[in-house]
Amino acid sequence: MTTANPFAQRSGLEYELPPFALIKEEHYLPAFYEGCTAQLAEVQAILDTPGAATFENTIVALETSGQYLMRMLLVFYNKSSSDTNDALDAIEEEMAPKLAAHQDAINLNPVLFKRIKDLYEARESIGLNSEDSWLLERYYKDLIHAGAHLTQAQRDRLKELNEELSKLETQFSKNILADTNDLAVLVETVEELDGLSENEIAAASSVANDRGHEGKWLIGMVNFTGNPVLDSLTNRELRKKIMEASLLKANRTNENDNKPVLLKMVKLRAERARLFGKETHAEHVIAVQTAQHPDNVHAMLRKIAPAAVRNAQAEADDLKKSAGTDIESWDWGFYTEKVRLEKYNIDTTKMRPYFELERVLHDGVFFAASKLFGITFKERPDLVTYHPEARAFEVNNEDGTKVGLFIADFYTRDSKRGGAWMNNLVDQNFLFKQLPVVVNNLNIPKPPAGKPTLLTYDEITTLFHEFGHAIHGFLSQVKYPRVSGTSVQRDFVEFPSQVNEMWILWPEVVENYARHHETNEKLPQEWIDNLNAARTFNEGHATTSYLAAATLDLAWHSLNSEEAAKVTDVEAFEAQAIKDYGLDFAPVPTRYRSTYFSHIFAGGYSSGYYGYIWSEVLDADTVDWFKENGGLKRENGEHFKNTLLGRGGSIDSMQMFRNFRGRDSKIEPLLKRRGLV
């Protein structure tokens, strides 16, 4: 192993921030291969340890293994998501199947499994504290879930499946990015952009110039169905063109077509599930989530779907009255804004000057976190990050002790994948005495030089949401990296981030950040009242669109091997799956169509997209608790941190919720919030 590679040892920088000034593309693959070799040697040393397995010589030893590899992977996947290029794509393509094989070499090792199984069966008698006991249980159950208990022949086939699936996931993601960039809509005259703000028009011009279309305008695609510009563009033909382009992402029978990729993935996942003794991929995945079985998920979604569609149909009737014609999917956002203005006197374009990014970040997002948890934020421009637009902020407690580092990467670029997400560059843990380094990525259009970044209300929601994930990472106070921060079940992880959205319109918060960027005038109270009054406005559309995507995920992954083999027409399957739930309402397309549904075919959410609304049950109940207990108060934040946020994944998720709430969750607050009762 060479020490010339910057990943070979801890960086020694503040917060163990990776040494981005030293990291070059040629370092990734050597670090990957050397890191894999080093971890396999560390695991072999565990297996060669004389005498019986103990918690220290097996579980703690596993926790300390693989650090070289992990340092490289955390940096690489952050970079390849937020600032990729052809070289990084090629590295990921080479690395993905080999990483799957490396993980299988550890997870499917029968000798290692026996050591952990022996420990697990003796867990009551070996004097473990609660966190150690839970970690042991996590290791044992994760290995079972990974297939460690299978026969040799089954394990061999499992390795082949995992390797092939990792290649397909990488291809799926690559295809979307390429096709999304290619589908951007070129606009010839500025008159066609009527309705867009001056900043939006300037941004479209800048993008067009960057891509060689001087004197024209380019409307880029986003990761979900539709596009934010549809809310304000008056040109109906252009709206239609943008919507139709959006629906075609990775679905044009070209080299970026994801239909054959996802069909193969569905078949292989179904085959893999059967190896595990499960009939479907959904059954296998959900077994280790808080929902426990697909039937429980279906029951909840079917309870919500009819009311959501009824609300969407009623909303469409209102829009039709305003439009004077039948509403198509490309009309929905535009006439929604008109009706919102008529019903609630909410003009989102007039609000944007009050939502300047720096003000929202410092006086909204950071302000609320400071009030709740007593943490402070200070920008550190001296710290080198992975991209000039990625800004570092140190996070401290009120007494000056360090909490961690927050990296904010907010602007869209061609090299960044769509959507918004949180990830770690360093996981908090006491084992290595490491503080968290947390990244938030968004895709806010960058204004021309010298112009302010004025946010939409949806972008503010995304900013608060992703920072909720960041808080979950910051406030982690656990011993072991495996259970740090957001290392919880998929159908639980969205809950803390959703709770953080409650502070957007909290009086003390909104009056602090919603100021006109030129005059410093407060957002008029009448407008704030109207925003609160309109909370359930358009919820029929939002819920129906989301549920269609969630049911589509479940439909693909509820196929057994024989059923999966028979599916050849992706679009027909998609339409039938949505129709089976009664969600087939043409003006409201699914939030994601299959060919660009990255969450489930490239993002680790397969059979898990339901988790957003499953988590929202906990979120709505928690929001009620905050309101009942005085809202934005330090003692409330401390209770939330001590019982839940700070525990990471170190105890059972639902037990954490009970510790926080004092009881099991109730669905009624969610139904009320979404206007479903």
Predicted regions and their residues:
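Intrinsically disordered or highly flexible coil/loop and linker segments, enriched in small
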Residues: T37, A41, A45-A52, Y68-S82, ...
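Short pre-active-site segment immediately N-terminal to the catalytic Zn-binding motif
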Residues: P445-F464
